[in-house]
Amino acid sequence: WIMGHMVNAIAQIDEFVNLGANSIETDVSFDSSANPEYTYHGVPCDCGRTCTKWEHFNEFLKGLRKATTPGDSKYHEKLVLVVFDLKTGSLYDNQASDAGKKLAKSLLQNYWNNGNNGGRAYIVLSIPNLAHYKLITGFKEALTSEGHPELMDKVGYDFSGNDDIGDVANAYKKAGVTGHVWQSDGITNCLLRGLDRVRKAVANRDSSSGYINKVYYWTVDKRQSTRDALDAGVDGIMTNYPDVIADVLNESAYKAKFRIASYDDNPWETFKN
C-alpha cells in the first residue's frame, strides 16, 4: 500500500492517486463536543508541505465517496484504503467513546451513504493515544445501533503513538479487538528514525501469536529509506511522494517481491509467503 500522506483537501485525492497512491491518510480534527469537524493538520507539519489545507469533514467524506464509488465520474479504481488520522489530543479521555459514535454516524451518512452503494474503500481508524481505546467501542456501538454492523467488515485500527507493542496489544484487548489491526511506526520526514520498532512489529505480525495484521512506516520520501523499509518487510509506506515509492517498487530487487495492493487484497489478512 502506497499511502499518500496528509490528504486533507478533496482536490488532493486526485493529485495523490495520480502520483501512484492506492491509499490516502487524512487528518481529522474534533470540536470541543467530540464531533469530527475538519480534515486539517495545521502547523507544524512535514517539511516541504503546506500544513493548512482543509475541508469540513462531512464534505471531505462526500468527495471521498465519489472517488471510491464505481461508476462515479470521480471514481479511482486503485484507491482502496483510507487511514483517518484522528487528532484526539484535543479531547478529554472520557470523550473518546462519543468521538467514536459521532465519527461512525458521519461516515455512515456521508461516506457509506447509509449502506446504499456508498464508498467501497477500507477504512483504518488511527488513534494516537492508547487511553482513547473506547473510540473503537463507541464507533462499533453506533454502527450497530444504526442497523449497519456489517460495515465493521470494512474497518480496521491503528494506534499511532509508537507505544510499546505489548501496551498496544493490551489496549486492543480492552477494546475487544481481535483482528483488522494495522500497526504504524514512524516520525515526521523532518527527522530520522531507525527501523528497530518496525522490525519488532513485523516479527509480531509474522509470529503465530501476534495481534498485528499489517505494518506501515511513515513518513518516507527518499529512495534509500523506501528500500530500507521494504527490506524490513513492511506492508505499507506512507509518503509525501507516492511516485518515489512507485519507482522503487519497480526496481528489479523489489519488482519480484512486492506489488501494489488492489481492492481484491484483503487489508485485514496477514500476508503469508
Swiss-Prot record:
Catalytic reaction(s) noted: an N-(acyl)-sphingosylphosphocholine = an N-(acyl)-sphingosyl-1,3-cyclic phosphate + choline; an N-(acyl)-sphingosylphosphoethanolamine = an N-(acyl)-sphingosyl-1,3-cyclic phosphate + ethanolamine; a 1-acyl-sn-glycero-3-phosphocholine = a 1-acyl-sn-glycero-2,3-cyclic phosphate + choline; a 1-acyl-sn-glycero-3-phosphoethanolamine = a 1-acyl-sn-glycero-2,3-cyclic phosphate + ethanolamine
Name this protein carries in UniProt: Dermonecrotic toxin LapSicTox-alphaIB1aiv
Family: Belongs to the arthropod phospholipase D family. Class II subfamily.
Matching InterPro entries: PLC-like_Pdiesterase_TIM-brl
Keyword terms: Cytolysis, Dermonecrotic toxin, Disulfide bond, Glycoprotein, Hemolysis, Lipid degradation, Lipid metabolism, Lyase, Magnesium, Metal-binding, Secreted, Toxin
Glycosylation sites: N250
Top-level taxon of the source organism: Eukaryota
GO molecular function terms listed in the Swiss-Prot or TrEMBL record: lyase activity; metal ion binding; phosphoric diester hydrolase activity; toxin activity
Residues holding Mg(2+): E25, D27, D85
EC id: 4.6.1.-
Intrachain S-S bonds: C45-C51, C47-C190
Cofactor: Mg(2+)
SUPFAM superfamilies: PLC-like phosphodiesterases
Function comment: Dermonecrotic toxins cleave the phosphodiester linkage between the phosphate and headgroup of certain phospholipids (sphingolipid and lysolipid substrates), forming an alcohol (often choline) and a cyclic phosphate. This toxin acts on sphingomyelin (SM). It may also act on ceramide phosphoethanolamine (CPE), lysophosphatidylcholine (LPC) and lysophosphatidylethanolamine (LPE), but not on lysophosphatidylserine (LPS), and lysophosphatidylglycerol (LPG). It acts by transphosphatidylation, releasing exclusively cyclic phosphate products as second products.
Keyword Hydrolase attributed: no
CDD domains in UniProt: GDPD_like_SMaseD_PLD
Tissue distribution: Expressed by the venom gland.
GO cellular component: extracellular region
Biological-process GO terms, alphabetical: killing of cells of another organism; lipid catabolic process
Principal location listed in the UniProt entry: secreted
UniProt source species: Loxosceles apachea
Compartments, record wording: Secreted
Pfam families assigned: GDPD_2
Active site: H5, H41 (nucleophile)
Co-factor binding details: Binds 1 Mg(2+) ion per subunit.
